[in-house]
Amino acid sequence: MLKQRTIKSLVKTVGIGLHSGRKVTLTLRPAPADTGIVFTRVDLPEAVEIPVAASAIGDTRLASVLQKDGARVSTVEHLMSACAGLGIDNLYVDVDAEEIPIMDGSAASFVFLLQSAGIEEQNALKTFIRVKKAVEVREGDKLARLEPFFGFKLSFTIDFRHPAVDKTGQTFSIDFADTSYVREIARARTFGFAHEVEALREMGLARGGSLDNAIVLDEHRMLNNEELRYGDEFVRHKILDAIGDLYVVGHPLIGAYVANKSGHGLNNQLLRALLADQEAYELVTFDRVEEAPVAFLPQAQPAFA
């Protein structure tokens, strides 16, 4: 059977909050079967636990933000993307600030952290959400859609009129039946424009942003000395974000995701639209491994995992 997964041992790291610029300590702990992924603000007078759920996402202007009882945990999408890519179902995430550390701006540090803790299967069936009919949300020319598909694949189109982005691919598709998340997606860094960073800093945000944790572009070129990690790193990062945004639904999705210029807000609207239509999805488990989509098979786990 396809089993749930958690990590074998506690693991901890320290990083910088993208917006606060402050030091953040992140601790990942094993969680029992059927726990899900639970974020806890351990710095508050009374710790607040926030289980991931589509309905728990509040602010989505700059990142995906979990909210509960006035407590917030921001910028969860890169860690959630790593959890999805490695097939982690159950995890306690303790953080002593209101945002997850940005690390290098990709999911690679979180993949390394989870792998260094060790990943173990649990004696419980992994539950999937299978998309049964197409669900779509739009905002102007922005679009996000989920379609029935026996596996997990994504296609994303961006539209940034910028010389450095134009030289790379603006559309990227990936099917995890035959492609590795760790190799092809995890290392893609977040990116932004210098004038936007300055505007955010004037608002007291992006204080931790730097060339060490983002690709930064001026009007004509990339300011980083380091070359792109992928020829089309910009759109691959949007795929990375989408994987993390979708995983807050609480289970891996069996389906196809298609997006044009989507972002955290539209991705969350898509999940809510899916869950609002009981005919659009079903919960499934697989007693026999060979009945499951190839993307989620144990031998493929170094692939989508």
Swiss-Prot record:
GO terms for cellular component: membrane. Its EC number is 3.5.1.108. It catalyses: a UDP-3-O-[(3R)-3-hydroxyacyl]-N-acetyl-alpha-D-glucosamine + H2O = a UDP-3-O-[(3R)-3-hydroxyacyl]-alpha-D-glucosamine + acetate. The active site is at H264. InterPro entries: Ribosomal_Su5_D2-typ_SF, UDP-acyl_GlcNac_deAcase, UDP-acyl_GlcNac_deAcase_C, UDP-acyl_N-AcGlcN_deAcase_N. The keyword Translocase does not apply. It is an enzyme of class 3 (hydrolase). This is UDP-3-O-acyl-N-acetylglucosamine deacetylase. It comes from Cupriavidus necator (strain ATCC 17699 / DSM 428 / KCTC 22496 / NCIMB 10442 / H16 / Stanier 337) (Ralstonia eutropha).
